[in-house]
Amino acid sequence: MARPLEQAVAAIVCTFQEYAGRCGDKYKLCQAELKELLQKELATWTPTEFRECDYNKFMSVLDTNKDCEVDFVEYVRSLACLCLYCHEYFKDCPSEPPCSQ
């Protein structure tokens, strides 16, 4: 049985592969693919009042090489930043883990 971290890594890779390629390059997310991924896979963490300009801004932050797409490295960096944010947020919480083991 896979451990939680192994499952998390597989989920990161599989989620990227599920959404990438609909606009062309199967190794990158275009803005529409990124928007759909955020809305469906991080629905509780993506504000419902996000406007198109918010997605444009988010895309420009993630797209570090400015090719108008998010490659896997840029995607993983964004998830790493999200993990860092969550770690900071939860580090002063009670010692009970936020998820069951």
From Swiss-Prot:
Changing C30A: Abolishes calcium binding. Keywords: Acetylation, Calcium, Citrullination, Cytoplasm, Disulfide bond, Metal-binding, Repeat, Zinc. The modification Citrulline is found at R51. It is found in: Cytoplasm. More than half of the arginine residues undergo citrullination by PAD1 and PAD2. Arg-51 is specifically citrullinated by PAD3 and promotes tetramerization. Binds both calcium and zinc. May be involved in calcium-dependent cuticle cell differentiation, hair shaft and hair cuticular barrier formation. Zn(2+) binds at C83, C86, H87, C93. The keyword NADP does not apply. Changing C99A: Increases affinity for calcium. Belongs to the S-100 family. SMART domains: S_100 (SM01394). Ca(2+) 1 binds at K28, E33. It comes from Homo sapiens. This is Protein S100-A3. CDD domains: S-100 (cd00213).
